[in-house]
């Protein structure tokens, strides 16, 4: 039995928790290497989950215990208000969880209860801005525009062997540091990948030095609502929730031209006027003649600029960083570090 809390976010007065309960054996660590066959087998085990509905999870927050019940896919989601505003600390708050009940009224007590720790990001009041980034073909090449390449990258290659785009980790760390040097600008990752890949993505981010942040993934369950919700709907919903959680914070949005990121970000700009500092779109066809996809992005960029927000279609991370320093998001020394790493590509 597994109790899997996912990294989430909140404010000093409200915390959002999300996690899942599965009746599966623990999977090998993403750090363990093996044959392609073993990798395929492990990926199948990761995707073929046995969910535990109607399980009871206890959340211990500031001396108070709250119980939440898992849904048909084994997920639990809840917003909690602490008894007093939380201090900032380093931005992350560990919260103890326990799995204390199973379906059919089975209770787990004492040593039988399964424990885990949730971590919740609470940005400080002096954060300069937030960063919201896509993952696939923005941080790491997935090949979402080509099904065979996407299958090969996702299922046949070990995640740790897939290098992030040159300069990405340095650029994201520079944005997190900002101009005040406090490294307290929150980073959020939004992806249409399923929650089943959470441990792989979390390990990947840590291994390659990307700033820690909530990973907002997608439920690929069989419920009708899940089947109806597409790539655009999921991302827009998650980004909207982040914006509404931090109504005084502005954001930098980062994505790619391979899917619907420019369309989603245009809608975000319209819903939240004055809240977007800049948008950087990685050109997945950089170096090629201008394509229909590039033309669409160029048109959208013009529409967004008319709203007062710069949106750039960039060939690489160095180009995004060069613009970011001009508009006061990062420091010149940080841009130099990004350029050095990007030149290694």
Task: Identify the residue ranges that each predicted region occupies.
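Alpha-helical substrate-recognition element adjacent to the catalytic core
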Residues: 8-11, 51-53, 69-72, 112-230, ...
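A short linear-motif detector with a strong N-terminal bias
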Residues: 35-38, 56-57, 109-112, 168, ...
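Short helix-terminating capping/connector loops at secondary-structure junctions
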Residues: 88-90, 125-126, 180-185, 246-248, ...
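C-terminal cap/substrate-recognition subdomain and adjoining C-terminal extension
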Residues: 193-345
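Hydrophobic beta-strand segments of well-ordered beta-sheets in folded domains
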Residues: 95-97, 130, 187, 251, ...
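A generic secondary-structure signal
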Residues: 46, 82-84, 171-178, 204, ...
């Amino acid at each position: 039995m597994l109790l899997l809390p996912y990294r989430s976010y909140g404010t000093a007065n409200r915390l959002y928790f999300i996690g899942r309960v599965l009746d599966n054996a623990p999977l090998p660590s993403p750090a363990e290497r093996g044959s392609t066959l073993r990798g395929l087998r492990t990926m199948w085990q990761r995707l073929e989950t046995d969910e535990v509905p109607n399980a009871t999870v206890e959340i211990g927050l500031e001396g108070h215990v709250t119980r939440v019940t898992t849904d048909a896919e084994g997920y639990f989601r809840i917003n909690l208000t602490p008894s007093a505003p939380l201090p900032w600390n380093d931005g992350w708050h560990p919260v103890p969880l326990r799995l204390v009940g199973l379906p059919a009224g089975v209770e787990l007590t004492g040593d039988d209860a399964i424990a885990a720790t949730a971590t919740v990001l609470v940005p400080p009041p002096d954060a300069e801005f937030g960063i919201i980034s896509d993952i696939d073909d923005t941080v790491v090449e997935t090949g979402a525009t080509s099904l065979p390449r996407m299958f090969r990258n996702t299922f046949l290659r070990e995640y740790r062997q897939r290098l992030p785009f040159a300069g990405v980790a340095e650029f994201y760390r520079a944005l997190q540091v900002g101009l005040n040097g406090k490294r307290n600008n929150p980073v959020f990752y939004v992806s249409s990948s399923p929650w089943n890949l959470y441990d792989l993505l979390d390990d990947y981010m840590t291994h390659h030095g990307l700033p820690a942040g909530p990973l907002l993934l997608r439920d690929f369950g069989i419920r009708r609502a899940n089947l109806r919700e597409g790539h655009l709907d999921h991302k827009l919903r998650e980004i909207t929730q982040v914006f509404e959680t931090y109504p005084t914070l502005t954001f930098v949005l980062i994505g790619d031209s391979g899917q619907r990121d420019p369309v989603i970000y245009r809608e975000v700009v319209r819903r939240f006027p004055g809240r977007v500092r800049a948008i950087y779109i990685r050109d997945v066809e950089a170096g090629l003649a201008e394509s229909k996809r590039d033309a669409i992005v160029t048109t959208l960029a013009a529409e967004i600029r008319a709203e007062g927000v710069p949106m750039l279609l960039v060939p690489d991370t160095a180009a995004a960083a060069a613009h970011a320093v001009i508009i006061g998001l990062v420091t010149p020394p940080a841009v130099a570090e990004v350029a050095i790493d990007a030149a290694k590509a």
